[in-house]
């Protein structure tokens, strides 16, 4: 404030001297002494004006306002220069602020639009980009992502048929391992029944339940995907089921034949046992004469 007050006082004194000399010159012809006096006053006036402008830009709003008023009261040209520079700086700051705020708003708007751009429909549709399935993280943002999702759906349905095939093979193994026909001695006498223990039965049934749980989960996910009514998804659900059954479902024909053979074997063993019991009963029956 001391520098600014001193500059203001010096500038005021210079203006008083300049006004006095101009008043004297207006009453008579301009002489050489008046011109030399004006030339001596102009350089200090320009220096003080520049210093006042720099001080006004670096100080607070009140100081800058007083600096602007002081400069406007000195010389029209210097006031215009300082006003223009202040206006330019404020215009640049306002432009930068506006650009920054608009950029931030545009970014936020774009992010919000991208986060809420999932296309959902309760009718038949063929959406590819911006389609969402089951969760918000499964958001299709490109064609490559959509193709990868389609292949994932196909492999999921093929894996379902593979699990079903695994359960059938496990059931066949259990039948072969613990079937009464496999433990019978048809040619030496009555069949010997040696079934699995209770703990083994519980363990085997637990494994079969795990197979069933996996099938149920995959089938439920397939149902949820189909509920989006996307034509591509439903089409490739069918394709995955077809390819899966084509690769892993060929055993169903032989299963029926093997089951009928096993049934005939069990019936044959039962008939032989019945005949054996009948022969023993006839041997022990006393004959009457």
UniProtKB/Swiss-Prot annotation:
Keyword tRNA processing appears in the UniProt entry? no
Q: Where are its TM segments located?
A: 143-163, 233-253
Which of the residues are on side Cytoplasmic? 164-232
Q: What is its main location?
A: membrane
Q: Which UniProt keywords apply?
A: Copper, Copper transport, Ion transport, Membrane, Phosphoprotein, Transmembrane, Transmembrane helix, Transport
Tell me which InterPro entries the record gives. Answer: Cop_transporter (IPR007274)
Phosphoserine-modified residues are 279
Parts of the chain on the Extracellular side: 1-142, 254-289
Kindly state one GO CC term assigned in the UniProt record.
plasma membrane
GO MF, one example: copper ion transmembrane transporter activity
Instruction: Explain the induction of this protein.
Output: By copper deprivation, and repressed by copper sufficiency.
**Bilayer disposition of the protein:** Multi-pass membrane protein
Compartments (UniProt record): Membrane
Q: Which domain of life is it from?
A: Eukaryota
Q: Which GO terms describe its biological process?
A: copper ion import across plasma membrane
Protein family per UniProt? Belongs to the copper transporter (Ctr) (TC 1.A.56) family. SLC31A subfamily.
Protein function? Required for high affinity copper (probably reduced Cu I) transport into the cell.
Quaternary structure and interacting proteins, as annotated:
Interacts with ctr5.
Name of the molecule in the record: Copper transport protein ctr4
Upper classification of the source organism reads: Eukaryota, Fungi, Dikarya, Ascomycota, Taphrinomycotina
């Amino acid at each position: 404030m001391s520098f600014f007050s001193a500059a203001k006082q010096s500038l005021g004194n210079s203006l008083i001297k300049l006004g006095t000399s101009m008043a004297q010159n207006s009453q008579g012809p301009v002489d050489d002494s008046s011109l030399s006096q004006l030339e001596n006053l102009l350089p200090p006036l320009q220096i003080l004006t520049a210093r006042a402008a720099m001080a006004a830009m670096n100080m607070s709003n009140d100081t800058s306002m007083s600096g602007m008023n002081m400069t406007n009261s000195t010389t029209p040209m210097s006031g215009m220069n300082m006003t223009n520079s202040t206006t330019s700086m404020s215009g640049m700051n306002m432009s930068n602020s506006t650009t920054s705020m608009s950029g931030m708003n545009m970014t936020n708007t774009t992010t919000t639009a991208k986060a809420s751009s999932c296309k959902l429909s309760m009718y038949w549709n063929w959406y590819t980009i911006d389609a969402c399935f089951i969760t918000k993280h499964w958001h299709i943002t490109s064609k490559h992502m959509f193709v990868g999702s389609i292949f994932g759906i196909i492999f999921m349905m093929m894996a379902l048929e593979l699990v079903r095939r695994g359960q059938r093979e496990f059931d066949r193994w259990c039948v072969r391992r613990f079937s009464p026909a496999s433990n019978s001695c048809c040619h030496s006498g009555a069949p010997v029944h040696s079934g699995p223990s209770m703990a083994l039965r519980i363990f085997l049934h637990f494994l079969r339940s795990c197979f069933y749980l996996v099938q149920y989960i995959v089938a439920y996910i397939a149902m949820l995907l189909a509920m989006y009514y996307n034509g591509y998804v439903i089409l490739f659900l069918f394709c995955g089921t077809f390819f899966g059954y084509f690769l892993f479902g060929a055993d169903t024909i032989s299963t029926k034949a093997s089951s009928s053979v096993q049934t005939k074997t069990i019936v044959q063993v039962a008939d032989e046992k019945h005949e054996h019991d009948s022969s023993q009963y006839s041997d022990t029956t006393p004959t009457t004469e």
